[in-house]
Protein backbone atom coordinates (compact mmCIF):
# COMPACT_ATOMS: atom_id res chain seq x y z
CA UNK A 1 0.00 0.00 0.00
CA UNK A 2 1.55 3.36 -1.05
CA UNK A 3 1.55 6.41 1.20
CA UNK A 4 -1.50 8.01 -0.45
CA UNK A 5 -3.55 4.82 -0.27
CA UNK A 6 -2.51 4.30 3.33
CA UNK A 7 -3.62 7.83 4.22
CA UNK A 8 -6.99 7.25 2.54
CA UNK A 9 -7.31 3.89 4.31
CA UNK A 10 -6.99 5.51 7.73
CA UNK A 11 -9.01 8.64 6.91
CA UNK A 12 -11.93 8.76 9.38
CA UNK A 13 -14.01 10.79 6.91
CA UNK A 14 -15.90 9.96 3.77
CA UNK A 15 -15.56 12.88 1.33
CA UNK A 16 -18.33 13.88 -1.09
CA UNK A 17 -18.19 16.23 -4.05
CA UNK A 18 -20.89 18.89 -4.15
CA UNK A 19 -22.95 16.92 -6.68
CA UNK A 20 -22.59 13.67 -4.73
CA UNK A 21 -23.73 15.39 -1.55
CA UNK A 22 -26.64 17.12 -3.30
CA UNK A 23 -27.95 13.74 -4.49
CA UNK A 24 -28.35 12.68 -0.85
CA UNK A 25 -31.21 15.14 -0.45
CA UNK A 26 -33.53 12.61 -2.13
CA UNK A 27 -37.12 13.72 -1.47
CA UNK A 28 -36.42 16.08 1.46
CA UNK A 29 -38.85 18.97 0.88
CA UNK A 30 -37.75 22.57 0.50
CA UNK A 31 -39.44 24.43 3.36
CA UNK A 32 -37.91 27.90 2.94
CA UNK A 33 -38.82 30.49 0.33
CA UNK A 34 -36.54 33.08 -1.25
CA UNK A 35 -37.50 35.83 1.19
CA UNK A 36 -36.75 33.62 4.20
CA UNK A 37 -33.39 32.56 2.77
CA UNK A 38 -32.44 36.22 2.30
CA UNK A 39 -33.08 36.99 5.97
CA UNK A 40 -30.79 34.14 7.08
CA UNK A 41 -27.75 35.39 5.18
CA UNK A 42 -25.02 37.22 7.12
CA UNK A 43 -23.32 40.37 5.85
CA UNK A 44 -21.19 39.67 2.77
CA UNK A 45 -21.98 35.95 2.88
CA UNK A 46 -23.52 34.15 -0.07
CA UNK A 47 -26.64 32.08 0.35
CA UNK A 48 -29.29 31.27 -2.22
CA UNK A 49 -31.99 28.69 -2.78
CA UNK A 50 -29.58 26.43 -4.68
CA UNK A 51 -27.13 26.35 -1.75
CA UNK A 52 -29.93 25.44 0.64
CA UNK A 53 -31.22 22.72 -1.68
CA UNK A 54 -27.86 21.16 -2.50
CA UNK A 55 -26.00 21.51 0.81
CA UNK A 56 -28.39 22.17 3.69
CA UNK A 57 -31.31 19.91 2.78
CA UNK A 58 -29.03 16.82 2.72
CA UNK A 59 -27.69 18.00 6.09
CA UNK A 60 -31.24 18.30 7.38
CA UNK A 61 -32.01 14.77 6.21
CA UNK A 62 -28.83 13.42 7.85
CA UNK A 63 -29.58 15.20 11.10
CA UNK A 64 -33.14 13.86 11.16
CA UNK A 65 -31.66 10.35 10.97
CA UNK A 66 -29.20 11.09 13.78
CA UNK A 67 -31.82 12.70 16.02
CA UNK A 68 -34.24 9.81 15.44
CA UNK A 69 -31.53 7.27 16.28
CA UNK A 70 -30.64 9.19 19.44
CA UNK A 71 -34.28 9.18 20.54
CA UNK A 72 -34.48 5.41 20.06
CA UNK A 73 -31.27 4.98 22.05
CA UNK A 74 -32.65 7.19 24.81
CA UNK A 75 -35.79 5.08 25.20
CA UNK A 76 -33.80 1.84 25.03
CA UNK A 77 -31.42 3.01 27.75
CA UNK A 78 -34.32 4.20 29.87
CA UNK A 79 -35.84 0.71 29.68
CA UNK A 80 -32.46 -0.81 30.51
CA UNK A 81 -32.01 1.37 33.59
CA UNK A 82 -35.62 0.97 34.66
CA UNK A 83 -35.95 4.68 35.35
CA UNK A 84 -37.99 7.52 33.92
CA UNK A 85 -35.69 10.37 32.89
CA UNK A 86 -36.46 13.65 31.23
CA UNK A 87 -35.64 13.59 27.51
CA UNK A 88 -32.44 15.50 26.84
CA UNK A 89 -32.03 18.13 24.12
CA UNK A 90 -30.01 17.19 21.05
CA UNK A 91 -27.08 19.64 20.84
CA UNK A 92 -25.35 20.59 17.59
CA UNK A 93 -22.07 22.53 17.56
CA UNK A 94 -21.08 24.82 14.67
CA UNK A 95 -17.40 25.83 14.53
CA UNK A 96 -15.00 27.59 12.18
CA UNK A 97 -12.95 30.73 11.66
CA UNK A 98 -14.06 34.32 11.90
CA UNK A 99 -15.73 35.38 8.61
CA UNK A 100 -16.29 31.80 7.38
CA UNK A 101 -20.09 31.95 7.64
CA UNK A 102 -20.87 30.14 10.90
CA UNK A 103 -23.83 32.35 11.73
CA UNK A 104 -25.43 31.79 8.33
CA UNK A 105 -25.04 28.02 8.64
CA UNK A 106 -26.43 28.00 12.18
CA UNK A 107 -29.47 30.08 11.22
CA UNK A 108 -30.23 27.98 8.14
CA UNK A 109 -30.06 24.79 10.18
CA UNK A 110 -32.32 26.29 12.84
CA UNK A 111 -34.89 27.30 10.22
CA UNK A 112 -34.87 23.92 8.46
CA UNK A 113 -34.88 21.76 11.58
CA UNK A 114 -37.73 23.77 13.12
CA UNK A 115 -39.88 22.78 10.13
CA UNK A 116 -39.51 19.06 10.70
CA UNK A 117 -42.69 17.17 11.53
CA UNK A 118 -43.73 17.30 14.30
CA UNK A 119 -42.44 20.83 14.75
CA UNK A 120 -39.51 20.59 17.22
CA UNK A 121 -38.41 23.52 19.34
CA UNK A 122 -35.00 24.58 17.99
CA UNK A 123 -32.96 27.24 19.81
CA UNK A 124 -29.69 28.88 18.80
CA UNK A 125 -27.05 30.51 20.97
CA UNK A 126 -23.59 31.85 20.18
CA UNK A 127 -20.65 31.54 22.53
CA UNK A 128 -19.98 35.28 22.10
CA UNK A 129 -22.23 35.79 25.11
CA UNK A 130 -19.74 33.88 27.24
CA UNK A 131 -16.80 36.13 26.42
CA UNK A 132 -15.47 37.96 29.44
CA UNK A 133 -16.58 41.63 29.53
CA UNK A 134 -14.18 44.08 27.92
CA UNK A 135 -13.29 45.65 31.27
CA UNK A 136 -12.05 42.30 32.56
CA UNK A 137 -10.19 41.53 29.32
CA UNK A 138 -8.48 44.93 29.46
CA UNK A 139 -7.36 44.40 33.05
CA UNK A 140 -5.99 40.98 32.11
CA UNK A 141 -4.26 42.30 28.97
CA UNK A 142 -6.38 40.04 26.75
CA UNK A 143 -8.20 42.48 24.45
CA UNK A 144 -5.84 41.57 21.61
CA UNK A 145 -6.76 37.92 22.21
CA UNK A 146 -10.51 38.34 22.21
CA UNK A 147 -11.96 35.15 20.75
CA UNK A 148 -9.05 33.02 21.96
CA UNK A 149 -10.00 30.24 24.42
CA UNK A 150 -8.66 32.23 27.39
CA UNK A 151 -11.03 35.13 26.66
CA UNK A 152 -14.13 33.08 27.49
CA UNK A 153 -15.82 32.42 30.81
CA UNK A 154 -15.49 28.67 30.28
CA UNK A 155 -16.96 27.61 33.65
CA UNK A 156 -20.11 29.64 32.89
CA UNK A 157 -20.42 28.13 29.40
CA UNK A 158 -19.95 24.59 30.72
CA UNK A 159 -22.50 25.21 33.48
CA UNK A 160 -24.97 26.52 30.89
CA UNK A 161 -24.57 23.44 28.68
CA UNK A 162 -24.76 21.11 31.67
CA UNK A 163 -28.03 22.72 32.74
CA UNK A 164 -29.42 22.41 29.20
CA UNK A 165 -28.39 18.78 28.88
CA UNK A 166 -29.90 17.91 32.25
CA UNK A 167 -33.26 19.36 31.21
CA UNK A 168 -33.40 22.39 33.48
CA UNK A 169 -36.05 25.01 32.75
CA UNK A 170 -35.34 28.58 31.67
CA UNK A 171 -31.55 28.52 31.54
CA UNK A 172 -30.07 31.98 30.94
CA UNK A 173 -27.27 32.86 28.51
CA UNK A 174 -25.60 36.29 28.46
CA UNK A 175 -26.17 38.47 25.39
CA UNK A 176 -23.31 39.96 23.37
CA UNK A 177 -23.56 43.13 21.28
CA UNK A 178 -21.54 43.26 18.06
CA UNK A 179 -22.27 46.98 17.97
CA UNK A 180 -20.60 47.78 21.29
CA UNK A 181 -18.26 44.76 21.03
CA UNK A 182 -19.12 43.82 24.61
CA UNK A 183 -21.46 41.87 26.87
CA UNK A 184 -24.81 43.63 27.37
CA UNK A 185 -25.18 44.17 31.14
CA UNK A 186 -28.14 42.43 32.79
CA UNK A 187 -29.53 41.11 29.49
CA UNK A 188 -30.02 37.39 28.92
CA UNK A 189 -31.43 34.97 26.39
CA UNK A 190 -33.57 32.27 28.00
CA UNK A 191 -33.35 28.70 26.74
CA UNK A 192 -36.26 26.61 27.99
CA UNK A 193 -35.99 22.89 27.26
CA UNK A 194 -35.56 22.92 23.50
CA UNK A 195 -35.72 19.71 21.52
CA UNK A 196 -32.61 20.83 19.65
CA UNK A 197 -30.01 23.44 20.61
CA UNK A 198 -27.48 24.81 18.11
CA UNK A 199 -24.31 26.25 19.68
CA UNK A 200 -22.20 28.43 17.37
CA UNK A 201 -18.69 29.69 18.07
CA UNK A 202 -15.11 29.73 16.86
CA UNK A 203 -13.72 27.49 19.58
CA UNK A 204 -16.59 25.15 20.45
CA UNK A 205 -14.54 22.07 19.45
CA UNK A 206 -11.58 23.09 21.59
CA UNK A 207 -10.02 20.37 23.74
CA UNK A 208 -8.56 20.82 27.20
CA UNK A 209 -5.28 19.75 28.67
CA UNK A 210 -5.14 16.14 29.72
CA UNK A 211 -5.35 15.85 33.53
CA UNK A 212 -2.37 14.31 35.28
CA UNK A 213 -4.39 13.12 38.26
CA UNK A 214 -6.98 11.24 36.21
CA UNK A 215 -9.82 13.62 37.07
CA UNK A 216 -12.30 14.45 34.34
CA UNK A 217 -11.83 17.84 32.68
CA UNK A 218 -15.02 18.66 30.72
CA UNK A 219 -14.88 20.59 27.45
CA UNK A 220 -17.69 22.24 25.50
CA UNK A 221 -17.84 19.53 22.84
CA UNK A 222 -18.51 16.88 25.50
CA UNK A 223 -22.11 18.10 25.38
CA UNK A 224 -22.46 17.88 21.59
CA UNK A 225 -24.32 15.10 19.82
CA UNK A 226 -23.26 16.35 16.38
CA UNK A 227 -20.79 18.99 15.22
CA UNK A 228 -20.15 20.93 12.01
CA UNK A 229 -16.87 22.63 11.06
CA UNK A 230 -17.00 25.21 8.26
CA UNK A 231 -13.67 25.27 6.45
CA UNK A 232 -11.95 27.50 3.87
CA UNK A 233 -8.35 28.15 2.91
CA UNK A 234 -6.60 30.90 4.89
CA UNK A 235 -6.09 33.35 1.97
CA UNK A 236 -9.81 33.07 1.22
CA UNK A 237 -10.74 33.71 4.85
CA UNK A 238 -8.42 36.71 4.93
CA UNK A 239 -10.08 38.16 1.84
CA UNK A 240 -13.56 37.60 3.28
CA UNK A 241 -12.57 39.29 6.53
CA UNK A 242 -11.21 42.34 4.69
CA UNK A 243 -14.35 42.60 2.55
CA UNK A 244 -16.57 42.33 5.63
CA UNK A 245 -14.53 44.98 7.44
CA UNK A 246 -14.93 47.36 4.49
CA UNK A 247 -18.67 46.68 4.36
CA UNK A 248 -19.01 47.37 8.09
CA UNK A 249 -17.00 50.58 7.72
CA UNK A 250 -19.69 51.78 5.34
CA UNK A 251 -22.57 50.70 7.58
CA UNK A 252 -22.42 49.72 11.26
CA UNK A 253 -19.20 51.61 12.05
CA UNK A 254 -20.99 54.91 11.33
CA UNK A 255 -23.16 54.40 14.41
CA UNK A 256 -21.62 56.53 17.21
CA UNK A 257 -22.31 53.67 19.64
CA UNK A 258 -20.11 51.31 17.64
CA UNK A 259 -16.89 50.19 19.31
CA UNK A 260 -15.28 50.56 15.87
CA UNK A 261 -16.74 54.00 15.13
CA UNK A 262 -13.20 55.41 14.85
CA UNK A 263 -12.71 53.37 11.66
CA UNK A 264 -15.70 54.88 9.83
CA UNK A 265 -13.75 57.80 8.25
CA UNK A 266 -10.95 55.57 6.91
CA UNK A 267 -10.27 55.46 3.19
CA UNK A 268 -10.40 52.13 1.36
CA UNK A 269 -6.61 51.86 1.55
CA UNK A 270 -6.50 52.72 5.26
CA UNK A 271 -9.39 50.39 6.10
CA UNK A 272 -7.81 47.52 4.16
CA UNK A 273 -4.49 48.00 5.98
CA UNK A 274 -6.31 48.08 9.32
CA UNK A 275 -8.26 44.92 8.53
CA UNK A 276 -5.09 43.10 7.47
CA UNK A 277 -3.36 44.12 10.70
CA UNK A 278 -6.27 42.89 12.84
CA UNK A 279 -6.46 39.66 10.85
CA UNK A 280 -2.77 38.88 11.22
CA UNK A 281 -2.49 39.95 14.85
CA UNK A 282 -5.60 38.24 16.19
CA UNK A 283 -7.73 36.19 13.83
CA UNK A 284 -4.96 34.38 11.95
CA UNK A 285 -3.17 33.48 15.17
CA UNK A 286 -6.41 32.18 16.67
CA UNK A 287 -7.16 30.19 13.51
CA UNK A 288 -3.74 28.54 13.36
CA UNK A 289 -3.29 27.90 17.08
CA UNK A 290 -6.80 27.14 18.31
CA UNK A 291 -9.49 26.76 15.64
CA UNK A 292 -8.01 24.80 12.73
CA UNK A 293 -6.51 22.09 15.00
CA UNK A 294 -10.08 21.25 16.14
CA UNK A 295 -11.33 20.52 12.61
CA UNK A 296 -10.64 16.75 12.86
CA UNK A 297 -13.01 16.56 15.84
CA UNK A 298 -16.09 17.55 13.79
CA UNK A 299 -18.77 15.12 12.66
CA UNK A 300 -19.21 17.01 9.38
CA UNK A 301 -16.87 19.39 7.53
CA UNK A 302 -18.17 21.86 4.93
CA UNK A 303 -15.34 23.08 2.66
CA UNK A 304 -16.03 26.42 0.97
CA UNK A 305 -14.41 27.91 -2.11
CA UNK A 306 -13.58 31.55 -2.76
CA UNK A 307 -17.17 32.26 -3.88
CA UNK A 308 -18.59 31.26 -0.45
CA UNK A 309 -20.15 28.16 -2.02
CA UNK A 310 -19.54 24.74 -0.46
CA UNK A 311 -17.35 22.67 -2.79
CA UNK A 312 -17.13 19.43 -0.83
CA UNK A 313 -18.44 17.76 2.32
CA UNK A 314 -16.63 15.35 4.63
CA UNK A 315 -18.70 13.10 6.92
CA UNK A 316 -17.07 11.21 9.77
CA UNK A 317 -17.45 7.47 9.43
CA UNK A 318 -19.44 5.71 12.14
UniProtKB/Swiss-Prot annotation:
Catalytic activity annotation: (R)-pantothenate + ATP = (R)-4'-phosphopantothenate + ADP + H(+)
Annotated positions binding ATP: 96-103
Keyword Nucleotide-binding: yes
CDD domains per the UniProt record, alphabetical: PanK (cd02025)
Entry keywords, A to Z: ATP-binding, Coenzyme A biosynthesis, Cytoplasm, Kinase, Nucleotide-binding, Transferase
Record's keyword annotation contains Kinase: yes
Location in or out of the cell: Cytoplasm
UniProt record, GO biological process: coenzyme A biosynthetic process
Pathway: Cofactor biosynthesis; coenzyme A biosynthesis; CoA from (R)-pantothenate: step 1/5
Protein name as annotated: Pantothenate kinase
Species of the source: Rhodopseudomonas palustris (strain BisB5)
Gene: coaA
Amino acid sequence: MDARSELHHYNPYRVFSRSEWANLRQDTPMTLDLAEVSTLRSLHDRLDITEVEEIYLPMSRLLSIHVGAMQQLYYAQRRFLGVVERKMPYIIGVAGSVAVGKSTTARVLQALLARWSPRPKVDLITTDGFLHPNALLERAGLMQKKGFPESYDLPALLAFLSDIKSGRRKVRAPIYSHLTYDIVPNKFAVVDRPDILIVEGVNVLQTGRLPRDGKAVPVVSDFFDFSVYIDADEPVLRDWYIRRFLALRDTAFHDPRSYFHRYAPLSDEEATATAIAIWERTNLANLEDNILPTRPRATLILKKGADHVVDSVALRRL
